């Protein structure tokens, strides 16, 4: 039962039932994505297997990384920060970020990171 005025029902989705694709940071399972926009979602969530990630940034979106497995290093504006299972990382818009090592993370983007909101330092071209 929905409370009157709500837009869509709650959602449960399992990683094994979610599409998987290659991203800038590694392989990701699309747990919640822009395809769910009609549900009124304000964010997306992906389970990502990071094996090193090229430094990049977003002008409009904030990201949260929660480390599920592994150990590595997250680079934020040139400063290296060790991360391990249980670490959480907040990445505001404009912060150049990347990673070293092999970690599995839950990445939440707020709002959804659009294709035209992925930039690489020194590049003048938008990348997807």
Question: Where do the model's predicted regions map?
Answer:
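Extreme N-terminal tail/first-helix region
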Residues: 2-23
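Double-stranded beta-helix
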Residues: 2-6, 38-41, 100-128
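A short glycine-rich, His/Asp/Glu-containing loop-to-beta-strand
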Residues: 17-55, 61, 108, 112, ...
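Glycine- and acidic-residue-biased ligand/ion/polar-headgroup-sensing regions
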Residues: 52, 60-72, 77
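Short beta-strand His + acidic residue motifs that chelate non-heme Fe in jelly-roll/DSBH
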Residues: 55-56, 74-75, 91, 95-102, ...
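Short acidic-glycine-tyrosine-enriched beta hairpin
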Residues: 78-94
């Amino acid at each position: 039962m929905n409370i009157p005025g709500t837009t869509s029902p709650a959602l449960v989705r399992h990683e094994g039932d979610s599409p998987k694709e290659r991203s800038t940071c590694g392989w990701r399972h699309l747990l919640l994505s822009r395809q769910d926009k009609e549900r009124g979602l304000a964010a997306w969530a992906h389970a990502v297997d990071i094996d090193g990630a090229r430094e990049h940034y977003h002008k409009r979106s904030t990201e949260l990384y929660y480390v599920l497995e592994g150990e590595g290093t997250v680079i934020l504006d040139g400063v290296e920060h060790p991360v391990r299972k249980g670490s959480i990382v907040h990445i505001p818009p404009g912060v150049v970020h990347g990673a070293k090592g092999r970690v599995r993370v839950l990445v939440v983007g707020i709002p959804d990171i659009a294709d035209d909101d992925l930039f690489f330092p020194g590049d003048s071209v938008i990348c997807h």
